[in-house]
Structures are given as C-alpha cells and as structure tokens.
C-alpha cells in the first residue's frame, strides 16, 4: 500500500493505492480521500474486463471535496483472477463491490457511478443494495444486454456498405480475427466508441489490459457488438422500477450503447434525469471532459444537499 498527499483548491487530498483482499483474491484500488469529507463516489469501469485507468478524469472531482474510489474488478487490470471460473458473472461482481464498499467506507453511503458494463453492474448493485446508495449514475450503461446488442446491430446497418459487408461476411464464417474484419470493427469503434483523433494514454492502458486478460472474452465475447459470453442474456429492465434513489443517466449522441438504451432506463426509473452529450460517443469523460465532470459534480452536489440526509 502506498500514500501521497496533494492540496488542490484548498482541499487536502490523500491518495491511497494498494490491494484489498476480497473473496480470497487481491483487488487493486486507488482512493482519492479528501480530509474531512463524507461525500463518496465509487466508480465502476466497463468491459467486462477493462480497468479503472480510462475513468481517471473523475479523479478531478476530489478537487471539489469528493472522495473518489477507483478499482479494477476481478480478472481485470491489476487485480487477480477469481478462484473459480463460475465467478465470471455480474452477481459475483456486485458482491465484490459490496465487500469493497464496506472495507473502504464502512457504514457510509456512496454515490455509485458505472460506465458501460460498469453501468449494468451499478444497476445490479442498486437492485440488491440500494440502502447503501445516496445516488446512482449510469453512464453509457445498460439494463439489457440483448436490447443493447440489437441497437448495436442497428448501428452496423448504418455503416458504409464496405464495412457492413465485411463485418457480416466474417461473422458468418466465425472468423473474428481476420485483419479485414478487425479493420471494420475499428471503424465502428471510431464512430461509436471514441471519436477523438488520438487515443488518450489511460484509454490505451485499459485496452492493453483487455488484451492481456481473459475476462472480456469469457464474459463478453470477441468484440463490443458480438456478445456471446456469460452476460449475453442478462436483462433486468423489468426490475428498474424498484430503484428509488436519485438517478442520473448519461449517454453520448453517437454512443454504441445508444440513446435508445439510455432512454429505456430513464423511462423505467421514476424521477431519473437523462443527459445526452451531443459531441460524444461512448467516452464522454474524454470527448467532452469538462462538461461531463460538471454534470457529474452537479448531481453529486444535489444528492448530498437533499434535506441534508446522511
């Protein structure tokens, strides 16, 4: 475990980095803890199989008095693989999250932000452990894998004929590693995953971890729109009405996890707020960083000021 201290905007921030022992394996975490603050944000990266690295812009929220916790989920980034292959599930992920919450924040409630697959994990957590939440943020997340895949297939139909034809051809052959197919997949990503000319280094690190580990392939599949892993049938849309904590839903206009997916969640969580980032695809925290952080900060400020409830 390591520590270092920084001071920003008058806040004293202790950055703690290390491992927590959870269910017999080491889970990596990084905590930006603000002296004297009880406002807690826990972040969930996507994948499944990514790492916390690409979410690091959210660390800036500690400059405004918000404790920010990042971690690499089981089988991801710097964390260990689960001991049992049957643990590559969303259910195991939410129990891991609850154990980490207890170890880091004790009895304190949290605001939970999940991005992409992390948004699905955040929803699953809220459905079981809502009593520990001050608020929920579903950022380019989903409540139904089948519906999300259906929406991604619609986006493929809107691609230029060249790429659409290539994707369909190699999918029919079951050849997901052909260079021509991978080139078409990368074009899809350039439109709907990240629309920046240069990929930021933290995003590169996350993709490097995805390539090194087996979690993405086990839980998801060969790529973003071919989901054949353990999460392929996951759908909790009909349970969303049970979520009653303040909820923010964000999505990019060009998102691979589409606006329609976000609207489905918004429609089923009473009182939720939906924000669409007009110049973003799947990574608004990079594509519209300042606006994204402003929206997240505003929501957290509102959640912690509501009747001054603790």
Swiss-Prot record:
It catalyses: Release of N-terminal proline from a peptide. Residues 41-288 form the AB hydrolase-1 domain. The keyword Protease applies. GO terms for biological process: proteolysis. Keywords: Aminopeptidase, Hydrolase, Protease. Transmembrane segments: none annotated. It is an enzyme of class 3 (hydrolase). The active site is at residues 116, 255, 282. It holds the Pfam family Abhydrolase_1. GO terms for molecular function: aminopeptidase activity. It comes from the Archaea. Its EC number is 3.4.11.5. Part of the tricorn proteolytic complex. Cleaves H-Pro-AMC as well as a wide spectrum of amino acid substrates and several peptide substrates without a proline at the N-terminus. In conjunction with the three factors F1, F2 and F3, Tricorn degrades oligopeptides in a sequential manner, yielding free amino acids. Belongs to the peptidase S33 family. This is Proline iminopeptidase. The gene is pip.
């Amino acid at each position: 475990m390591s520590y270092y201290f920084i001071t920003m905007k008058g806040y004293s921030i202790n950055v703690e980095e290390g491992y927590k022992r959870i269910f017999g394996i080491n889970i990596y975490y990084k905590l930006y803890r603000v002296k004297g603050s009880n406002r807690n944000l826990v972040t969930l990266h996507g994948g499944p199989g990514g790492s916390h690295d690409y979410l690091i812009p959210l660390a800036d929220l500690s400059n405004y008095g918000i404790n920010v916790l990042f971690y690499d989920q089981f089988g991801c980034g710097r964390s260990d693989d689960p001991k049992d292959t049957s643990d590559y599930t969303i259910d195991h992920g939410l129990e891991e999250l609850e154990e980490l919450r207890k170890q880091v924040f004790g009895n304190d409630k949290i605001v939970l932000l999940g991005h992409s697959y992390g948004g699905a994990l955040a929803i699953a957590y809220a459905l079981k452990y809502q009593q520990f939440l001050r608020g929920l943020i579903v950022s380019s997340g989903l409540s139904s894998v089948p519906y999300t895949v259906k929406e991604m297939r619609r986006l493929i139909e809107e691609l230029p004929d060249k790429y659409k034809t290539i994707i369909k051809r190699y999918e029919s052959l079951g050849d997901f590693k052909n260079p021509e197919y991978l080139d078409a997949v990368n074009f899809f990503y350039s439109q709907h995953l990240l629309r920046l000319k240069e990929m930021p280094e933290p995003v590169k690190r996350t993709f490097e971890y995805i390539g090194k580990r087996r979690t993405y392939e086990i839980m998801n599949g060969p790529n973003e729109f071919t989901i054949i892993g353990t999460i392929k049938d996951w759908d909790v849309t009909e349970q969303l009405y049970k979520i009653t904590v303040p909820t923010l839903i964000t999505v990019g206009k060009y998102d691979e996890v589409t606006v329609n997916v976000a609207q489905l969640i918004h429609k089923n969580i009473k009182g939720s707020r939906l924000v669409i980032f007009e110049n973003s695809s799947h990574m608004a925290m990079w594509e519209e960083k300042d606006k994204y952080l402003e929206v997240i900060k505003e929501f957290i400020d509102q959640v912690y000021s509501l009747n001054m409830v603790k």
